[in-house]
Amino acid sequence: MKYNQYAYVETDFQQQVKELIDINFLPKNYQVWDFSSLLAKLVKNAIAEAKTDAAKNAKLAEFAVSDHQTLADFLKEKPTEIGTEQFYNVALQLLGYHVHYDYDFADPTGFMQRNALPFVQDISDNQKLISAFYRLLNTRAKNGQILLDVMAGKGYFTQFWGQNKFKFFNGKSIPVFDTNKVIREVVYVETDLDTDHDGKSDLIQVTVFRPEETNKGLKVPALYTASPYFGGIIANEKRNHNVDENLSDSTEWNDPQYVHSPIVKAEKPDGSSRPATEEAVHKSSYPLNEYMLARGFASVFAGAIGTRGSDGVRITGAPEETESAAAVIEWLHGDRVAYTDRTRTVQTTADWCNGNIGMTGRSYLGTLQIAIATTGVKGLKTVVSEAAISSWYDYYREHGLVIAPEACQGEDLDLLAETCQSNLWDAGSYLKIKPEYDKMQKQLREKEDRNTGQYSDFWEARNYRHHADGIKCSWISVHGLNDWNVKPKNVYKIWQLVKKMPMKHHLFLHQGPHYNMNNFVSIDFTDFMNLWFVHELLGIENNAYNQWPTVMIQDNLQADKWHEEPDWSNDLGQEKIYYPTDEGELFQDGNGKAQKSFTDVGGIEFKKAGISESDWQYKFICGDEKWAKPSLRFETDEFIHPTTIVGRPEVKVRVSASLPKGEISVALVELGERQRLTATPKFLMRGGQELGYRFGTDTLQEFVPDKKTKAKLITKAHMNLQNFKDMKKPEAIDADKFYDLDFLLQPTYYTIPSGSKLALIIYSTDQGMTKRPLEDETYTIDLANTEIKFYEK
């Protein structure tokens, strides 16, 4: 598998020497060293676990330059150069590879080439040896980290603890901070909100992890993760809304309105500051933050209103949530007051912070990054938003229908608010908050409007895209192309806005579902984040803006292949339109004339079968007779050449329904029995990545070829028939009358290999996402007025 590397910054020899000397890897008087002695010195320096020269010398005998000579014996000969194969036999061992198991003595560079590991051809003098080692220290080891990080995990950089300053290598911050002395403290930031209606502004509990060196005058940036889950979650799956019910008449919609909570202005900072008096008991919960904390970046967590330690009630997705989370950045930047405890008597400032804040986090944590970025809050320099919601309507609804996130049937805004209302866990807080919490829950249940599923002012207040013009910070989005929790159109739609803005922006699309990608084999994402944060938050010019293409997309056939694109949109491809035929085929010159029908039975058979939603989906897309019966399927011939679908497919369907209401679902599926990638990354080295020195670990993982399957969902979408004219305004429809639907599927970037077919499936009830009616309904499709349009690359 290829260990692709994008974050390595090309560096001239003089800079290499300067950096190597700065980390005590290269002797300052290297010019007077002979080749053999210098080679021995550099190898021994890389053996960071051995702490004495005697121990390092003993270790040399454990390395071999060939199938007949150890490194120790080779060095005894006082060589004046080293062959490329000899050097990289040793290098691969330093990188954690095992001869005979991973590679052969006879061809180390061939192995490196196959795995995208860099090497140099000529190591015939001291200068070339030094450059070869500089590159080796920046080469990804078997565990996915660069060798320098592997050495850090063995204690190499403890020699620099207490020096009270950052150090950089190849444009990245290195772990020279004593992680045994991390300051772990809690403060209380005062907001301008009163969501619990007690007449006082809500306090937000903020947990800070910062280097001890900041108590000695060092100012550092902060990585802030706004996590409503940080204080704990209240399990409530058993109270999910019932989805086994008939569809309602959407014309009953009454456009529920959003109303902001009372505003109570916070005190202004008075210039005084005392140290925090409460110690953090929660642990940092995000590996990327931990990794950067060891490298000098403070890690800050806050759950915002309604979470444990904070005042207020949860109002999922509302402006109040955004404002309370943004207040933390205002405090970090010096613009808002915080107190040492809940008595509000002693102020404390973030005088350890340099005023530059970046944000991290996935899912809800990524969502709040988008929300906060749209406020343009001062101090926020960059966001790294993973698997984030850009409109809550697009999370819980679609085209006039109630649509569940994957594996969350029956969940909605009110239940997510309950999940995160962790301040109810404290008995005193429960007594105070519970009455106001109950009122808010009632309001959320009413206004989220599960009866009609329609867009409203309530949902408009939760659409961050409509405030995108407020974004001032640089932008990185990360999303899984197979994320059916936070569906891809959330990132696609915000990307279409961000890409037109002047600030620097990047997009990473991987093959996962609702997943992080910082520990993948196929891409050095963590190294890029290090480079990025150093540039954005420390102001170091390190070429971060030029290291990566604007858009990086992981291939769905080969996990270690990444496509470099200028954009992610329909413009990447050529428009193609396919039409269904009466015989169930799908052609560009299809000429179907028939009207074909299917009868949807809602969730009746699904409930009887007792299978999971994911099992149902696989059987359904494969064409299992029992589950495919309530649908129409149209298939292309086998593709002769690989074809990549990019952007957002669009479907037009002329349909009539036997009832004056209905829901239509459409899926695009790749058909063909073949080996596909695992649905989730496989753990390849559990706990194999050290985040610092004895400071937590992460697990190397990657998608790998899995057992053969018959089909793979590419994309899908759903629509309410009563929105045939307007996605934001329902109209009454008549039974047995044809209506034209025109709607977009989730965006994709998917390669159909030669030998596979493309299938268009038209159906109604999606057991994992839509409501599951209790009554039968027959749908008739007019094939002459039905088509699927997409863009081929």
Curated annotation (Swiss-Prot):
Q: What class of enzyme is it?
A: hydrolase
Location(s) in or outside the cell: Cytoplasm
Q: Which reaction does it catalyse?
A: Hydrolyzes Xaa-Pro-|- bonds to release unblocked, N-terminal dipeptides from substrates including Ala-Pro-|-p-nitroanilide and (sequentially) Tyr-Pro-|-Phe-Pro-|-Gly-Pro-|-Ile
Task: Name the InterPro entries for this protein.
Answer: AB_hydrolase_fold, Galactose-bd-like_sf, Pept_S15_Xpro, PepX_N_dom, PepX_N_dom_sf, Xaa-Pro-like_dom, Xaa-Pro_dipept_C, Xaa-Pro_dipeptidyl-ppase/CocE
The record's keywords, sorted A to Z, are: Aminopeptidase, Cytoplasm, Hydrolase, Protease, Serine protease
Chief subcellular location equals cytoplasm
Q: What biological function has been recorded for the protein in this entry?
A: Removes N-terminal dipeptides sequentially from polypeptides having unsubstituted N-termini provided that the penultimate residue is proline.
The Swiss-Prot or TrEMBL record describes its family as follows: Belongs to the peptidase S15 family.
Name of the protein: Xaa-Pro dipeptidyl-peptidase
Taxonomy of the source species = Bacteria, Bacillati, Bacillota, Bacilli, Lactobacillales
